[in-house]
């Protein structure tokens, strides 16, 4: 088998509405998932023994390459579901280019990329891939196809969006190099249902008129998130900006690539200590 390569695309929540708490203790969400063209890089090559994972890259420090890693859990789930199709082992390299605990997919995107890569190569039915993704985490199903979708429930109930107007939209992701605890952010949400996502008009209009209900508690715990959002909002040509997921990564969409590039250069001067990724929406 040749060495397989796949991108684990960075996830962005263009809007994230927390509608309440469900009987099972999870929060009911409405969100618009979008994805950058860039992310972590996965490589895998079959072997005759067992799975092994090597984690490299600028954000590899502190990550465990053990059986609890979502990438290895994804391979295990595939092998258990299709024992006659999946080899005994894979030698896997994860190039961790995105910040960890940052609100942009992280382990979920990595697991989804592994499912997508192995599933496509061994011709595993897409419905099975999505079912396995759902068993691995709330954001994993959306990350499998990594395209513009609406999510409900805990994010796993997906509705395709026909509006393709955001494809190739210039994007800037910024993280102040702090990590956010998702449970802590949800714990500090004020419990107020501020209403549903707009379902009329363009997807950009729905996103802009929406909000991220986790941004206020995240900014309260980590005020630097507010500094990032405010810096982004001040840049020329910004369509809109806010925090993604439970933070601390924030994003800005631009109307023109030139304005995004100018903002990226300016960020490296104003805040060289912050992490940034200049990309496009898929």
From Swiss-Prot:
ATP binds at residues 99-109. It comes from the Bacteria. Pathway: Isoprenoid biosynthesis; isopentenyl diphosphate biosynthesis via DXP pathway; isopentenyl diphosphate from 1-deoxy-D-xylulose 5-phosphate: step 3/6. InterPro entries: GHMP_kinase_C_dom, GHMP_kinase_C_sf, GHMP_kinase_N_dom, IspE, Ribosomal_Su5_D2-typ_SF, Ribsml_uS5_D2-typ_fold_subgr. One of its GO terms (biological process) is terpenoid biosynthetic process. The active site is at residues 11, 139. It is an enzyme of class 2 (transferase). GO terms for molecular function: 4-(cytidine 5'-diphospho)-2-C-methyl-D-erythritol kinase activity; ATP binding. Its EC number is 2.7.1.148. Keywords: ATP-binding, Isoprene biosynthesis, Kinase, Nucleotide-binding, Transferase. Coiled coil: none annotated. It holds the Pfam family GHMP_kinases_C. It catalyses: 4-CDP-2-C-methyl-D-erythritol + ATP = 4-CDP-2-C-methyl-D-erythritol 2-phosphate + ADP + H(+). Gene3D superfamilies: 3.30.230.10, GHMP kinase, C-terminal domain. Belongs to the GHMP kinase family. IspE subfamily. HAMAP family: IspE (MF_00061). Catalyzes the phosphorylation of the position 2 hydroxy group of 4-diphosphocytidyl-2C-methyl-D-erythritol. This is 4-diphosphocytidyl-2-C-methyl-D-erythritol kinase. It comes from Zymomonas mobilis subsp. mobilis (strain ATCC 31821 / ZM4 / CP4).
């Amino acid at each position: 088998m040749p060495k397989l390569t796949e991108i684990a695309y960075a996830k962005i929540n263009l809007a994230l509405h927390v509608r309440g708490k469900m009987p099972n203790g999870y929060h009911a969400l409405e969100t618009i998932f979008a994805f950058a063209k860039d992310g972590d890089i996965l490589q895998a090559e079959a072997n005759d023994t067992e799975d092994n994972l090597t984690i490299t890259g600028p954000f590899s420090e502190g990550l465990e390459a053990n059986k609890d890693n979502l990438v290895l859990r994804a391979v295990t789930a595939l092998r258990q579901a299709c024992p006659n199709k999946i080899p005994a082992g894979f030698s896997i390299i994860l190039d961790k280019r995105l910040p960890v605990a940052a609100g942009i997919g992280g382990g979920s995107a990595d697991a989804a990329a592994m499912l997508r890569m192995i599933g496509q190569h061994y011709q595993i039915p897409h419905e099975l891939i999505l079912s396995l993704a759902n068993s691995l985490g709330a954001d994993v199903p959306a990350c499998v196809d990594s395209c513009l979708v609406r999510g409900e429930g805990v994010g796993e109930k997906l509705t395709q969006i026909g509006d393709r107007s955001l494809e190739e939209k210039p994007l800037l992701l910024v993280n102040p190099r702090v990590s956010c605890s998702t449970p802590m952010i949800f714990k500090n949400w004020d419990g107020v249902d501020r209403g549903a996502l707009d379902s009329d008009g363009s997807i950009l209009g729905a996103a802009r008129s929406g909000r991220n209900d986790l941004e206020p508690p995240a900014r309260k715990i980590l005020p630097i998130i507010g500094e990032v959002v405010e810096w982004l909002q001040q840049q020329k040509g910004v369509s809109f900006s806010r925090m993604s997921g439970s933070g601390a990564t924030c994003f800005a969409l631009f109307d023109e690539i030139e304005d995004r590039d100018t903002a990226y250069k300016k960020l490296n001067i104003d805040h060289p200590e912050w992490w940034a990724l200049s990309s496009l929406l898929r």
